[in-house]
Structures are given as structure tokens and as C-alpha cells.
Regions:
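Short, intrinsically disordered, charge-balanced linker/junction segments flanking boundaries
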Residues: 331-333
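Active-site regions of oxyanion-processing enzymes, predominantly non-cytosolic
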Residues: 252-253, 258-262
Length: 333
């Protein structure tokens, strides 16, 4: 069976970007890069194959108009689903009202599965692949995005790259003693390495969550928790973490999410002896995320949350030859 023009274009995007993708993986993972590259390539192919036809048509449209999100008529709104409508189904009923307001961009605050009540407003994620049951289902989210698209409204969701909730299945497996999943996080038997980190790494919330590490009584280990004790930092030195996270991003894109606000992105790579902020490896990961999205779902836009000094911001756009984020978000500017 002959490949469609859309399929051929996907093949061309993969071929064009494979060399750079492998180089970036090698930069981060050395001898593990080949396996990571195979896994990531298979993920991109399977995610593209699973992408709904209407979203592939949107990809084609956006490729012809790559700066669509910069148009002067873009008008956005941010809201909590439950406060505005109750749940995703009820929000879908309000799409005609949003269209009447000339809305073209809707940012829904975190709605993926989270622990209750302690969840940092949804930024402690228990499952990157599932809508929180209090708000609906994945099918409800897909139905909402379809209705929004028909009304000319693009949906933005947060994606928390730096950490998971301590109740995430990976963290639970780590707590149960599984070394595979302990390597998804930063876990230490004693204070030797944590003390070395603490000597140079500033605290994010010194008043409300002092310290960068939390003792897990179940594991009898210290765990890196840059934000709150119930948010465990992911270990991107493990290529399985990167591939797993990218799988979740692509899954949400295939539900119709058009913009991802990637949360706390400057923090995602840790290097002993540094302040663990804005490291070169962070930019390598963001560049890979951009490449993967451009290959599989080029309609999707990246908005990086970079709450750092203004001099740090421009680097997150990347370069014209190797772009990273399409847009940046800084609450202090």
C-alpha cells in the first residue's frame, strides 16, 4: 500500500532530524545513546501512526503557516476547569460562549491525575497519561479539544517535566525497593551526596519547603525534592526517563493538545558542583523535545516556563538553526 503524502512527509522529517537527535542523545548518554535512539525512533513512529487523521490535517495546515501562534488576533485565557465549569464535559458545553468572546487560545491549569488534597495545585502529577477523575476522562479531553478546534481555539496544557508526585507509580515502585525505578529519581543511602548538592544548590521554597532532599522512611534513602517533599525530581541521566516522558507528551498531543507549557524546565538536569539551573543538558533535552514534536505532531507549540533572570531567557528560544521553545513564560516580567 502506497504511503500518503502526510506519511511521506513524516518519513522525511524523521530522516532530516535523525542525525541531530542521535548526536544529542550521545551528548547526554554516551554508550546508552544507541538504545535510546532506537526506543525514541520507535516511539515517534508508533505515536505518528496513532495520531488521529484530523490532527494530521492540522499538522499539514500548521506546516504551511508555522507562525500561526504569533498572529495579532490571538486572544488567550487561563482557567481552572473545575472553577469555571466543574469538569471537562461541562467545559465543552461552554465552548460557544468562549468563541463569542473571540478566544483563540485556552490554557487549562493542571488536570492530569494528582493526589488529593496535597498536589501543589496539580503540579504534583500522579499519572502523566491520565486526566484526573475529578475532572473527567481522556475521552472527555479529546472531545473537548475537538470542539475547541472547530471553534478556532487551541488548547494549552501544563506538562511538569521536573518531577512526579511521590504517589506516582514509578515512585511507589522505588519506595517498594525496585532499583529500576529508584534510578528514575535521585536516591541516596546517606547524606554524603545530598550535602554536596546543598552546599551549592539554592532552595526553591526556603520558607515553606526548606532543604533539597527528603528522607523516605520506606526506602531508607534520601530523595531529591527540589520543590516540595511530595514532588520527587526525575533523573534525566536515565534515558528511560526521557523516553517515558516524551511518550506521555506525545500521547497528550494525540488527544488534541496544541500547546505545552513545560513547567520548571531550567531545573530538569542536575550536575554536582553546579547550581543545577539552566545547564547545557537542559537545552539539549528541550531541543530534543522540539525535534520530536516537529517530527510527529508539527502543529504543536512549546511554551517554556523559565522563571529565571532575564539574561537567561533568550537561550531557551534556541537558535534559528536549532530552535527550542516557540514561546517563553516568565511571571516576573
Amino acid at each position: 500500500m502506497a504511503r500518503s503524502k502526510s506519511d511521506q512527509a513524516f518519513d522525511e522529517r524523521i530522516a532530516k532530524n535523525s542525525e541531530e537527535l542521535h548526536e544529542l542523545l550521545t551528548e547526554l548518554y554516551g554508550e546508552q545513546a544507541d538504545e535510546a535512539f532506537r526506543n525514541l525512533t520507535e516511539l515517534m513512529k508508533s505515536s505518528y501512526a496513532a495520531r488521529p487523521a484530523d490532527l494530521k490535517r492540522l499538522d499539514t495546515k500548521r506546516l504551511a503557516d508555522p507562525e500561526w501562534y504569533k498572529r495579532g488576533n490571538m486572544f488567550g485565557m487561563t482557567m481552572y476547569t473545575d472553577l469555571f465549569a466543574g469538569d471537562l464535559k461541562k467545559l465543552a458545553d461552554k465552548v460557544p460562549y468562549l468563541k463569542e468572546q473571540k478566544l483563540t487560545y485556552l490554557h487549562l491549569m493542571p488536570l492530569l491525575k494528582m493526589p488529593h488534597p496535597q498536589n501543589d495545585g496539580g503540579y504534583a502529577v500522579e499519572d502523566f497519561d491520565t486526566v484526573d477523575p475529578s475532572l473527567g476522562t481522556n475521552e472527555d479531553l479529546a472531545a473537548l479539544t475537538k470542539k475547541l478546534r472547530a471553534a478556532g481555539i487551541s488548547l494549552c496544557l501544563d506538562f511538569v517535566m521536573n518531577h512526579t508526585a511521590s504517589s506516582h507509580r514509578w515512585a511507589k515502585a522505588a519506595q517498594a525497593g525496585d532499583p529500576k525505578y529508584q534510578d528514575y529519581y535521585y536516591c541516596y543511602d546517606d547524606r554524603t551526596v545530598p550535602d554536596q548538592y546543598d552546599a551549592v544548590v539554592p532552595e526553591v521554597f526556603p520558607a515553606t519547603a526548606p532543604g533539597n532532599f527528603t528522607w523516605s522512611e520506606q526506602m531508607h534513602k534520601w530523595v531529591l525534592t527540589s520543590f516540595y517533599p511530595f514532588q520527587w525530581d526525575l533523573n534525566y541521566r536515565n534515558p528511560s526517563v526521557l523516553v517515558s516522558v516524551l511518550s506521555s507528551v506525545l500521547g497528550l498531543a494525540n488527544l488534541g493538545v496544541e500547546v505545552f507549557r513545560i513547567d520548571a524546565v531550567p531545573y530538569i538536569w542536575k550536575e554536582l558542583g553546579t547550581n543545577c539551573r539552566n545547564l547545557p543538558q537542559v537545552h539539549a533535552i528541550v531541543r530534543m523535545l522540539r525535534i520530536v514534536l516537529e517530527c510527529v505532531c508539527p502543529a504543536v507549540v512549546l511554551k517554556g516556563e523559565v522563571v529565571m533572570a532575564p539574561k537567561e531567557l533568550a537561550a531557551y528560544f534556541g537558535t534559528p538553526e536549532k530552535p527550542e521553545c516557540h514561546m517563553l513564560y516568565n511571571v516576573s516580567i
